[in-house]
Amino acid sequence: MSNTLYFDVKGNSMFPTFKDGDSICFEKFNHHRIEVNDIIVCKHPFKTDFNIIKRVTKIKEKKLFIEGDNKEISSSEDSHNFGYINTNKVIAIKRN
């Protein structure tokens, strides 16, 4: 079984790292260590069946603060909107 997962970028929250329409290869998350600056795919904390791609910018007591790379405030729905997320929301990871 492959540990590789592909996700399509929708929107510009991760610009300039990823652009709308990019297909990005991630490693399936198997509860290995997450570090600041890793890019993750996770389940949205409040929207059912909705995944988001974000960068981990802070880790506090095994919870993650995630942000989009696009610095325009309105471009990203992230931890600024919903706070820290639990690692059980993480689906896949891309190391930097």
Outline where the language-model segments fall:
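Extended hydrophobic leader/signal-anchor segments used for secretion and membrane insertion
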Residues: M1-N96
